[in-house]
Amino acid sequence: MQLRDKLFINGAWTAPHGKGTIDVHSASTEAVIAKIPAGDEHDAAAGVAAARAAFEGWAATPPADRAAFLAKINEGLKARSEEIGKTIAQEVGMPVKLAT
């Protein structure tokens, strides 16, 4: 079982203000395959504030630079595609091949 205990807010993994967790279930077995932080209104407000603060800078970034940044994100997702695909397949009950 995977245990994630932080939220990604403002470019960093941070401990959530909220103390609860959410169980992620396998669609086929209903077993708990992961636990993720539930967060609360303070966590949501921090995420929204970070997004608002970043918006003007992102909007002013030249399109070529934004494209390069998105290409790096794509590389990271491709590098983890097997892990991500397996998690999605378990959670929604689809074949791994379709989830990757």
Where are these regions (language model features)?
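Glycine-rich loop-to-alpha-helix module at the N-terminal edge of alpha/beta enzyme cores
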Residues: 33-100
